[in-house]
Each structure stands twice: as C-alpha cells, then as structure tokens.
Amino acid sequence: MLSLVIPVYKNEENLPRLFRELEQVAGRLADELEIVFVVDGSPDASLRILREHLATWPLRAQLVELSRNFGSFAAIAAGLRCARGEFMAVIAADLQEPPELILEFHRVLKAGDADIVFGYRTGRADPWWSRWLSESFWRLYRRFVVRDMPKGGIDIFGCTQAVRDRVLDLKEINTNLIALLFWLGFRRAFIPYERRARLEGRSAWTVGRKFRYALDSIFNFTDLPIRMLLLLGVGGTGFAVIAGLTVLIGWSTGHVPVLGYTPIMLVITFFGGLTALGLGIIGQYLWLSLQNARNRPAFIVKSAETFEPHSAGCRSASASTRNSS
C-alpha cells in the first residue's frame, strides 16, 4: 500500500479539485492507496470540508488534526507517523505539484531502485520575483550546504517505510525535512517535473515563512555563517592592525597628519556592526540548540480519524494530546 501524506493549511478552495485528481490517480495506481490529510491548524473550513467529504469517499483515508499551526514540515512528520503503507509519498494540497508524480514515485520504490525518490522542479509558473528568489536561494544552498541538491530545489518526495522510520527517529524541530533526507543517505532517485500555477486561493507560504525556512535550512545543516564570521573577524583585525601601523608610522615621520575623529568613528561603527552581526548568528545557533534541548514534541495531534472506502462514516476516531516526530 502507498500512503500519500497531504498537509492542509488554508486550502479549502483547492480541495474539490484535489479530490477529483486523487481519484484519477488512485484508478491508475497498481496498488492500494491511502490518503493521510493533516490539517495544520488551518483557520478556514478545510477540516469541515474534509470530514464531510471523506465520510462518503471511495478511497481509504485518514484525517489528522493538529492542535495548532506547527508548520508544513511538522505536519508532514505527523502524517508520516500515522501512515500505514509500505511506501510513503508527500505532495502539497494546492496541486502545484502534479499528483501524477505519485505514480512515478511508486514505480521506482516498488521496483526497489531507490529508497527515496525526490521530485525536483525544472521550471515553475510563479511570478518572476518568486522564481528569482527561489533560484538564488537553491543555487547558494547547493553551493554551500547540500551539494547534491538539484538546482530547482525540492518540495515533494516518496520513501520506503524504513526511511520513514529513520526520519521519525530524529528529534530535531524547526528544521528542513528535505535536507534531513539528504543527510540520512540511502539510495536516491530524482524525477523532474514542471511546477504548475496555483489556480485557487492564495499561498500561505509568505515571505516571512520563506525567510524563516531559509534560516532553519542554513543554521541546522552548516556552520558556514560561523566560519564566514570568523574570516571577517580575522580579516578585519588584520586590516585594522595594518592600517593602524601605517598611520602610526606615517604620523611619526610627519608624512600623515592627524585626521581627527571621523576615521575613528567609521572604524568603531564598522566593527560595532560586525559584532552585532556575530552576536545574532551565534544567538541563532544557541536558540536552535535550546529548542532541541527542551525536547518538546514537533507537533501535537488533537484528533485522528480513519475513513474506509465506501463507508457511511468514519470507522474509528481517536485523540492524542502528545505526539512528536
């Protein structure tokens, strides 16, 4: 069985089309399909729409409700924990990634050709500024952090049950799930696709969320900011020593007049800003260390329901007050 995990946040307008496309994919899949919807504290009517539709849906499904919004990667982890299939796959509810990719994921995993299958973007129907920011970020991320990362970046993947178990063994929070999968190793396969335009609703992936995601992706997987700060500090100190000696020698020989307070203030301002930057970088690492040391769960499941095919209602429902990835 293939378990398909779909995090849901502000997707009520996309759900009717999502149901139709999933039914089409299920008809073409050479295996049983289970859909795990994870409502990540969505403030709209997504939970109600899902519960009503799944009660009479011809596909096997689970509906997991988190106690609040924990973020898409925490929601994915919650769905992976609840999934019962031999193989897993993850897509977004906005349908910008074509659900047909699930068929390719399943084919590769079923054949045993790989343990993890990534779908990577070869193009995207997004505004130019969004494309530019995304391409710039992934280019730098590939250069300095995860060198195996495809140029277009990755949002969706499929994996075996063994990989899922190893992912859930990791207790990191505020992290990048895709980078964790690369860190784990295992055999990988890559399938290209063209990212589609969003047809309904507005993306909840705001600039602020993207910025936070970028910081988590960097600080959790590289010490590059610390090393850059060290190089800046060494270079700045060396420059200050050389400049100071040059001015001192020139002043003592009468070739350089005393210039007043302006150069001193500029140097103080420069190194003061550098110090503040360094404290911010170190503080970010300390904050991430504190978050992980607290050992809080990455998510909390408020309720979980199971819907069997052609059922008049849900077969079982259960609630959990503590669940973590």
Residue ranges and their predicted role:
Residues 64-68, 72-82, 99-180, 196-215:
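Acceptor/aglycone-binding surface of glycosyltransferases and processive sugar-polymer synthases
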Residues 9-13, 96, 100, 168, ...:
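Residues in soluble alpha-helical coiled-coils and helical-bundle/repeat scaffolds
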Residues 1-126, 318:
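Structured catalytic core of nucleotide-sugar glycosyltransferases
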Residues 176-325:
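Hydrophobic helical membrane-anchoring modules
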Residues 52, 143, 166, 220, ...:
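Transmembrane helix-loop junction
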